[in-house]
């Protein structure tokens, strides 16, 4: 079974919460950005990654705004579920922007990245990475992949919400980047069942198809699917 959750920020205690107990061997947990367990390559971090690698289920995440992209990009690219991902551990994968994965006969469009609200502070302290912001080329590649699939997928996994959702939720309403316009185009031009996103640090359903996820661990499919 496939589940989805929100930003983890390298907090291993999240895996001890009751919501995570539903995960079983063979399940897949999708994380909507800010995975955060690959940050400083410390011994403590390596210990935590080892614990995660011993889980009986698979963890697959899109990147968010609080990631060490220099470290992430050191992991090799592999084919996974019909798309390309970085192999972190045998059961941990970094989903690449614009890729489409087939999981349990369902198609998932993944697109990480975004813009840090604390950009100026993090830039000054040396822990901000330009790669957090999706490039025009990444967006163009995503469009090509969607077109190859007749602009139809089952589920969308992102870190940022579309611009119209930011207005609805009252978060970052002044912030408009190319990625937000791209997501608005997806709303208008693509067919999909549900769209899950992180970043906003809230758990909320926005009718009819959108899910802001943070601490919830939601099954992707339900009876209506």
Language model feature labels by segment:
Residues 21-23, 103-105, 145-152, 211-213, ...:
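A structural signal for the main folded, soluble domain(s) of proteins
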Residues 8-9, 35-36, 65-68, 114-115, ...:
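Catalytic metal-binding/acid-base residues of hydrolase active sites
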Residues 5, 10-103, 172, 179-183, ...:
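Core catalytic region of metal-dependent phosphoesterases/phosphodiesterases
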Residues 83, 90, 103-177:
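Active-site-proximal loop/helix segment associated with metal-binding centers of metalloenzymes
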Residues 58-62, 84-90, 163-225:
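Conserved beta-sheet core of the metallophosphoesterase superfamily
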Residues 4, 28-32, 155-159, 196:
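Structural motif
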Residues 1-3, 99-110, 155, 207-211:
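Beta-strand-turn-beta hairpins that frame and shape the catalytic cleft
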């Amino acid at each position: 079974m496939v589940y989805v959750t929100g930003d983890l920020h390298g907090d291993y205690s999240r895996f001890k919460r009751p919501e995570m107990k539903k995960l079983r061997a063979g399940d897949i947990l999708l994380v909507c950005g800010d995975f955060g367990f690959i940050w400083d390559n410390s011994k403590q971090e390596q210990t935590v990654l080892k614990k995660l690698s011993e889980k009986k289920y698979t963890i697959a995440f899109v990147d968010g705004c609080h990631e060490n992209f220099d470290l992430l990009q050191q992991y090799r690219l592999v084919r996974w579920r019909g798309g390309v991902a970085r192999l972190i551990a045998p059961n941990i994968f970094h989903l690449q922007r614009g890729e489409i994965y087939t999981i349990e006969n369902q198609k998932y469009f993944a697109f990480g990245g975004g813009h840090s609200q604390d950009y100026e502070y993090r830039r000054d302290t040396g822990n901000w990475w330009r790669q957090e912001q999706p490039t025009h080329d990444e967006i163009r590649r995503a469009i090509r992949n969607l077109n190859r699939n007749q602009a139809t997928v089952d589920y969308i996994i992102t870190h940022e919400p579309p611009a119209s959702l930011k207005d609805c939720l009252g978060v970052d309403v002044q912030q408009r980047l190319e990625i937000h316009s791209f997501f608005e185009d997806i709303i208008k031009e693509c067919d999909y069942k549900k769209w899950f996103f992180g970043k906003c640090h809230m758990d909320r359903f926005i009718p009819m198809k959108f899910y802001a996820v943070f601490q919830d661990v939601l099954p992707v499919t339900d009876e209506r699917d």
